[in-house]
Amino acid sequence: MKTTYFYLGAFLLCLTSCKKEVKIEEKTIIEADTVPEVTTTTENPAEPMDSVAMHKAWEEYATPTEPHKRMTSETGTWNEDLTFWMSPNDKNPQKYTATAEVKMILGGRYQEQKHKGKMMGMDFEGISTLAYNNASQEYTTTWIDNMATGMMIATGKFDPSSKSTTFSGEMVDPMSKKSKKYRQVVTIIDNDTQKMESFDETPDGKEFKSMEILMKRKK
């Protein structure tokens, strides 16, 4: 009998609870109907890249490709003939000679060039790096030397038809202290000969050829 009363009490308790839940739900529905609808928009977050795709992307980014092979083929010692023009109408350009040691660094991912020579009666040293970015599919070159305290950085793309890479960059003019644009064109003449042409700007923004370096591989 106690068991019967127990189950009966439990049944009544459940029934009461159900009625309370129904009343609460009805009250909630009624109250919801009286509340004005508010529309909100949320931006969908970018879906996270799965670990496999991420690993593949970084592996492709880090693996040397065909442009790196071409850079590797330039390893060696190069003799350089340098010509400088100070202005568009310079009839007496300055000429110097130098040598460059070219090698690949960091597992064949970057090219390093170390230049040495004599300029204006002083020892000259310069270091340049060349990188090919697999992600952006463009080249980046940097330049520093012992006759300045700034770094020149330029980017460009290779044109297979002309076998040349055109770089564009900006530098601060030591005279005006203002930024100005410059352009460089590196042309592959043959496996052992290259030409680098640098174009500067006059104060009024006109471009002129300011430097040429003819590089020949030492055999």
Identify the function of each model-found stretch.
Residues 6-13:
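Sec-dependent N-terminal signal peptides
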Residues 62, 177-178, 202-210:
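A short acidic/glycine-rich loop-to-helix N-cap element
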Residues 15-17:
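C-terminal motif of bacterial Sec signal peptides marking the signal peptidase cleavage site
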Residues 81-183:
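Central antiparallel beta-sheet cores of small beta-barrel/beta-sandwich binding domains
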Residues 3, 19-91, 218-219:
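Amphipathic/hydrophobic helical signal segments and adjacent flexible N-terminal regions
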Residues 45-49, 53, 152-154, 180-184, ...:
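Asp-box/BNR beta-propeller blade signature and adjacent active/binding-site loops
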Residues 192-204:
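Low-complexity, intrinsically disordered Gly/Pro/Thr-rich segments
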Residues 106, 188-192:
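Residue-level recognition of beta-strand termini and adjacent short loop/turns
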